[in-house]
Design a protein with these regions (language model features):
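A short, charged, Gly/Pro-tolerant segment at domain boundaries
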Residues: 157-173
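A short, well-structured juxtamembrane/interface segment
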Residues: 6-23
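Residue-level recognition of alpha-helical structural elements
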Residues: 10-13, 95, 159-160
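Helix-enriched interaction subdomains in cytosolic or periplasmic regions
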Residues: 1-3
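Glycine-rich phosphate-binding loops that contact phosphosugars or nucleotide phosphates
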Residues: 22-142, 146-156
Length: 173
């Protein structure tokens, strides 16, 4: 499945996304169900790359986030089908407000994909018994890990080292 995702990915999409992410200080994630797990992992990685990130599990909060998001925020959607009605409502609102939209999906011809500025297509399988959602999550995590690695190339190593030192001095577990 990961080989399939790797073959589907277009390097120019990563460059387009990197350009959008480099211009912003804040990434708002929009996802539902198991995709929220990927959004949370990506958000914690992006924070390490100096990108403030927001993830809300409740759809009400995602709607509110979209209504108040400054246009400088980049919206990052994770949707296997690209046809979730609630995510579509949010994406349409963000598009009207002028926000850039990134999308990870298994459906590059979906309605949500048509609203996105950058689309990452990942593998899935059609039948639930073939673990379709799990295959999708694996590919989605792969994409967010690559984006994190790209963002980290833009971070000053000394800054990262200072953060690490501060954390080790002030947080003892």
């Amino acid at each position: 499945a990961l080989k399939d995702t790797r073959a589907m990915l277009d390097p120019s999409e990563f460059m387009r996304a990197l350009h959008l992410l480099s211009k912003t200080e804040h990434v708002d994630f929009y996802a539902m169900d198991n995709n929220l797990d990927i959004a949370n992992m990506a958000a914690s990685s992006f924070i390490m790359a100096n990108k403030c990130s927001t993830v809300h599990a409740a759809m009400t909060m995602q709607y509110l986030q979209a209504t108040g998001a400054p246009k400088e925020h980049v919206a990052f959607f994770i949707s296997r089908t690209g046809e979730n009605r609630m995510l579509l409502d949010i994406a349409r609102l963000l598009k009207l407000r002028g926000n850039s939209i990134l999308l990870i999906t298994a459906s590059p011809e979906s309605t949500l994909a048509s609203l996105a500025d950058s689309v990452f297509r990942v593998a899935t399988v059609k039948r639930m018994e073939e673990l379709g959602p799990r295959v999708f999550l694996l590919g989605a995590k792969y994409v967010t890990d690559i984006l994190f690695a790209l963002l980290m190339t833009r971070v000053d190593y000394r800054n990262t080292q200072q953060k690490e030192e501060w954390l080790s001095q002030h947080f003892h577990y």
